[in-house]
């Protein structure tokens, strides 16, 4: 009995220690909650969707956090980037309209401004931390409106602070994101509606903006590091967008290729592909070349996690900057000089042709490259309404309309002018010349023809 009593007494101090630690942790959670939750915003944008061949407006839900006393809110581009009307509910449950200031699909960041006229409450501002100082295993809180449940808080840890995703990841609007940044991975619960909300450390500082969740697995959420967000918001507040330089290079991690290319460990960036007509292609670079230096500074992307730093080394320069690249091809090294160009918009403006039953988009250079189009003339068909005139005329999503009744369509403005003129004139039959998979074909829009749904058997 004495021995059993002795063992039991030895365990008591441990119990008290655990209780004290739990109390301290709980207090830290409360502190972090109280510092950030008042700045949390429940966002209800009304977005426009053109993908079905007609303009549809729908209400969605997201989150955001106030980062400036004038009422500026940071959220995700995929939450508010396509919004025409935005309403924000603050922590005191007051709802205010907000204006879209600008966004950056490449990092999935957007900025809103609350309309504070007539609002007599207090604007609480969250403190933005330093994502470069975070640690794997660090305790964090995720705040937002999961499944539209506003003012929600979940807890977890930082699982990884430098997760990389290829730039082929696309936002719901179709734009690519992820090339220029790494992601914070957390096991704190993140669901639909959490997007745009803050990831918070236990000191009550925002270290990331929640952006992505993996719904095929539990406890896998991802946030944009707050230092990336800071850079994006500064540019958006100044210009409404983020300006980047571009040379048209897609890079690949070099680790598995070092023996073949004969490069030193941690030296060089492998060119996997080049965009046609890009500065790099015009300067004579080729897939398989290894970039060793930019303006005399060594560069390396041995691992995929190092690729964003390489892209940013170019993108962060003003467009029109002359740069010098030291390049290795085979066993030879040479210097290539070129000039950067603006990256430009990832996607063009959308437009609905309601009478024809289709939606189109202006073609940007990045769209031309992504869709392997011959050039950027014409308009890109983003949607065809089922059994509408365009559908019955044989148009498909992804077609490029080059001519309308033999008139060339250089861009969306030319198309709008032609469409409105034909509509005003009451023209019922229109001939379209379209490009599909590199081939040209004719499609006829017949406004006197109407399709009918066939009954299901």
Summary of predicted features, one role per range:
Residues 127, 284, 394, 402-408:
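Exposed loop and linker-edge segments at protein-protein interfaces
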Residues 288, 398:
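Conserved catalytic motifs of ABC-family nucleotide-binding domains
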Residues 1-4:
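Positively charged n-region of N-terminal signal peptides that target proteins for export
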Residues 320-322, 427-429:
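Extracellular Ig-like/FN3 beta-sandwich strand-entry sites
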Residues 345, 352-393, 397:
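C-terminal structural cap/anchor segments
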Residues 7-16:
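Bacterial N-terminal signal peptides
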